[in-house]
Amino acid sequence: MSNMITSPQYVAGHGLLEGKSVLITAAAGAGIGFAAATRAVEEGCRAIVISDVHEGRLAASVDKLKAETGLNAVWGLVCNVTDEAQVRALIDFAEDKLGGTDVLINNAGLGTSKLLIDMEDAEWDKVIDVTLNGTMRMTRYFLQCVKAREQGAVIVNNASVLGWRAQKEQAHYAAAKAGVMALTRCSALEAVELGVRINAVAPSLAVHPMLRKSAPEELLRELEAREAYGRGAECWEVANVMMFLASDYSSYMTGEILPVSSQRA
C-alpha cells in the first residue's frame, strides 16, 4: 500500500480563507476543532474565535494557536452549546471581535457508547442536546445576526457517517448526527435568501490523542480495520475538507454532506 495513504503528508495552506474571519466551537485540545482552527489560520484567515467548555484547555489552545501560527488575532470564549445564553454571548463576542463572522464551524458534539436497551433518558438527551440541539442553537442565532447585518456567510457542520450507517451502542449519537444532516439540508434552503451557504462534513473515523486514550485498543483496531486504508483519518484531513466547504471554491454548494471516509472494506 502506498506510503502516502498509510502516512499522509501534511499539505501547506493555499489561501483558501484569505482575509476571512472564523468562529469554531469545541476547538480546544487535540481534536478536529483545533485542527480546523490551525488549518483556518494556515489558509489565511485574518482573525479567529474558538470556544470550548473547558476554560483551562481553551486558554492553552488560544496560546498554542498564536504561538504555532504567528496570528495574534485569536480569541477564546467558554461556551456550552446547550445553554442558549452562552450561545448568544459567544456569537455576539465573535461578531464584535471579528467585525462580522464570515465562517462558522459547528464542531461541538458528544459521543458515548451504550446499548439502547440499557440507556437512560438522561444519557440519550445529553448526546442529542449537545450534538444536535447545540448545532441548531448556534445556527439559529448566527442566521439572525447575519440577517441583521445583511452580509453573507458560510456555515460548516460536523456530522458523521453514522448518520447513514448503523453501529452497535451508537443509537443516540447516530440519531443526533442524522439530525445534524437533516438540519444542514433544511436550514441551507432557508438561508439562501440571506446569502448563507450551509454544508457539512461526515467523517467516518478520525483518530486523535483523546480517542486513543479512551477507546479500548481492541475496539480501535477493529474500527481502523474497517477502513480501506487500514487507519482512521488524521484530524487535519477532516479539517481540510472543512476548509474547502468554508472557502469560495465551494461557492455553488449548499445543503450538501461530504463524507470524509475511505471506502469501507
Which residues does each predicted region cover?
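Short C-terminal tail/terminal secondary-structure segment
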Residues: 2-12, 31, 165, 226, ...
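Canonical Rossmann dinucleotide-binding motif of NAD(H)/NADP(H)-dependent dehydrogenases/reductases
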Residues: 10-49
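Substrate-binding pocket helix/loop in short-chain dehydrogenase/reductase
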Residues: 115-116, 120-128, 211, 219, ...
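C-terminal substrate-recognition "lid" of short-chain dehydrogenase/reductases
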Residues: 136, 231-261
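Active-site helix of classical SDR
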Residues: 139, 176, 184
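Alpha-helical segment proximal to the catalytic Tyr-Lys
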Residues: 144, 189-193, 251
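Residue(s) in the substrate-gating loop at a strand-loop-helix junction
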Residues: 160
